[in-house]
């Protein structure tokens, strides 16, 4: 696709998304990547094609390159492959049948344990035992999940985040055998799309 055609398609996608035109500067680089980001939608219908563990590992390696608060790297990705664990997690959110059918299920965790462990290794008292100990790892986990969605899209996959796994965090932590201070933030179903999705509207840019 030519640069002019890509720019026109990007303008069209953004107008669909926001209900108004967004200027695409002439000569802007990275139009294919911008088109992918502008056209994102959550998917809940998967093809029968499996998602190989090797592909998930590659996506995780790309996703974990996301920015991290103070380089502490307080986010983890769990690739839930065990059928019994998948069933137990799905039982926590039974109103989502498409979750059970997803070829891959990832759980993104805020890891507040890693920072505390650094203090323990040096024999020092932990001085950050307050809200930041949860907030910063949660932001790290969110950044890693968004990177995962972008990486998956680049590989031809689609996904849908699942916040409802937090409805029973203690039970989910038990299913995943998480240590203390490692908190599940969100799930992400991944698969190859069974069909195209429409662009979902967003508030106008002026609203932000």
Where does each model-flagged region fall?
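Acidic, surface-exposed loops and disordered segments
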Residues: 1-208
């Amino acid at each position: 696709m030519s640069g002019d055609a890509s720019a026109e398609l990007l303008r069209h996608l953004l107008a669909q998304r926001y209900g108004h035109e967004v200027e695409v500067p002439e000569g802007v680089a990275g139009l294919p990547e911008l088109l992918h980001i502008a056209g994102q939608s959550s998917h809940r219908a998967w093809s029968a094609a499996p998602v190989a563990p090797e592909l998930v590992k590659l996506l995780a390696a790309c996703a974990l390159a996301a920015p991290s608060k103070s380089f502490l790297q307080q986010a983890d990705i769990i690739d839930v492959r065990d059928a019994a664990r998948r069933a137990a997690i799905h039982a926590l959110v039974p109103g989502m049948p498409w979750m059970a059918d997803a070829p891959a299920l990832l759980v993104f965790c805020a890891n507040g344990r890693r920072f505390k462990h650094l203090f323990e290794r040096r024999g020092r008292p932990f001085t950050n035992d307050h809200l930041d100990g949860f907030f910063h790892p949660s932001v790290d986990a969110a950044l890693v999940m968004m990177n995962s969605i972008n990486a998956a899209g680049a590989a031809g996959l689609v996904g849908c985040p699942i916040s409802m796994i937090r409805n029973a965090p203690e039970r989910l932590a038990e299913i995943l055998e998480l240590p203390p201070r490692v908190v599940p933030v969100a799930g992400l179903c991944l698969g190859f799309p069974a069909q195209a999705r429409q662009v979902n509207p967003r508030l106008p840019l002026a609203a932000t």
